[in-house]
């Protein structure tokens, strides 16, 4: 099933590439440079992800740890506070807890270490100016890029009935999360009228949100029972939760960027911006979907 699912992703990418080339041929005046760049980046993302998700579990965990590291590093370039380098060691420790299936320690490690060690460490520096801003900014970045994001990796550790079960759960989550972004964008562009958060993200509309959520619920209803142990009702609810939480992750990251005064979080992914621009929705959907499916099925 994993091989067929990945083959479907490649088929969709081929279709998108052909449609884009056809439109560029038929409408030469159309500016399709950004779309072409985005599709090329998607090719790189899907090829890399396919290799990792098809490999051994340690490889997938290492990949997620690398994503957390790059995301945290990118976040550090955005905020105007000094980020202690020793905090980066929390990333391999966090993913080691996942690899050894230490769920209780995982729940405590990042939140408790951030609450106690981070705050105490800043006090020992000796300068209390900007203490609250510094600690909260660092802690929020650590929670987002390491703790929340690593819940996607935890899906690999759930006691599934077959060896590919965890990988299929990750694929299901990522496919719906990214499709949700695309669906909400397309619905918003086609029939969006009422803005949801105009001061944060003017392009987000109520019609785009509702259309995207309904689309993802239908997609989840179709592929959920195939890739996951969810039944029909649970698959619908999973689609609803992913659709709404993905929107929340998107606008929260937009609020952070607006507060800092930047449009994109970086330039790591051509046509997409930074890594945080690509995984902002996943930061929220990963923990929501993990606890939902763990409660419902495990």
Curated annotation (Swiss-Prot):
It is a multi-pass membrane protein. One of its GO terms (molecular function) is transferase activity, transferring phosphorus-containing groups. GO terms for biological process: peptidoglycan-based cell wall biogenesis. Keywords: Cell membrane, Membrane, Transferase, Transmembrane, Transmembrane helix. It is found in: Cell membrane. InterPro entries: PC_trans. It comes from the Bacteria. Its main location: membrane. GO terms for cellular component: plasma membrane. Belongs to the CDS family. PANTHER family: PHOSPHATIDATE CYTIDYLYLTRANSFERASE. This is Uncharacterized protein YnbB. It comes from Escherichia coli (strain K12). The lineage of its organism: Bacteria, Pseudomonadati, Pseudomonadota, Gammaproteobacteria, Enterobacterales.
């Amino acid at each position: 099933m994993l091989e067929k699912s990945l083959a479907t992703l490649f088929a969709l990418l081929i279709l998108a590439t052909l449609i884009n080339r056809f439109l560029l041929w038929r409408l030469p005046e159309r500016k399709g440079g950004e779309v072409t760049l985005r599709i090329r980046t998607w090719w790189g993302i899907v090829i890399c992800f396919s290799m990792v998700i098809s490999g051994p579990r340690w490889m997938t965990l290492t990949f997620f740890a690398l994503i957390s590291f790059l995301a945290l590093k990118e976040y550090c370039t955005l905020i105007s506070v000094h980020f202690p380098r020793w905090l980066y060691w929390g990333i391999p420790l966090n993913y080691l807890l996942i690899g050894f299936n230490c769920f209780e320690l995982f729940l405590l490690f990042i939140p408790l270490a951030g609450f106690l060690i981070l705050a105490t460490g800043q006090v020992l520096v000796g300068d209390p100016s900007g203490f609250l801003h510094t600690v909260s900014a660092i802690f929020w970045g650590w929670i987002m890029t390491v703790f929340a994001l690593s819940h996607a990796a935890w899906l690999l550790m759930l006691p599934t009935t077959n060896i590919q079960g965890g990988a299929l759960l990750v694929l299901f989550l990522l496919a719906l999360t990214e499709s949700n972004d695309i669906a909400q964008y397309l619905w918003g562009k086609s029939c969006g009228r009422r803005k949801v958060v105009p001061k944060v993200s003017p392009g987000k509309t109520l019609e785009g949100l509702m259309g995207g959520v309904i689309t993802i619920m239908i997609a989840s209803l179709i592929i959920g029972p195939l890739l996951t142990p969810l039944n029909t009702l649970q698959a619908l609810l999973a689609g609803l939760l992913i659709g709404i939480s993905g929107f929340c992750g998107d606008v929260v990251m937009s609020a952070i960027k607006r507060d800092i005064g930047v449009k994109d979080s970086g330039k790591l992914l051509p046509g997409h911006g930074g890594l945080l621009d690509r995984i902002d929705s996943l930061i929220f959907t990963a923990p929501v979907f993990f606890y939902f499916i763990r409660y419902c099925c495990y």
